[in-house]
Curated annotation (Swiss-Prot):
Keyword Signal: yes
Pfam families: Defensin
Protein name, UniProt field: Defensin-like protein 58
Covalent S-S links between cysteines: C39-C73, C43-C66, C52-C71, C56-C72
Record-linked InterPro entries: Defensin-like_dom
Amino acid sequence: MNITKRYVVIFFLVMLTKSLSNSDVLVSSVIETSKNDVCFIPCTRRYGDWECYDDCLGKNFNDGGCVDGRCCCKK
């Protein structure tokens, strides 16, 4: 019984540590994309800044580009 409790506690500690270690990455992504109105399609080698910009203009946005691997449009 004690071994099971220890494994459960260790498991939760690992999960907590793992979730906290990614928080800096997530925050920087949110801060960077908060300057944009909408972000959607993932950017790739074939779908880059120019394609993203063109799609944003087609959706009546004034500007657009790849931000953190996603196409983001600005009004």
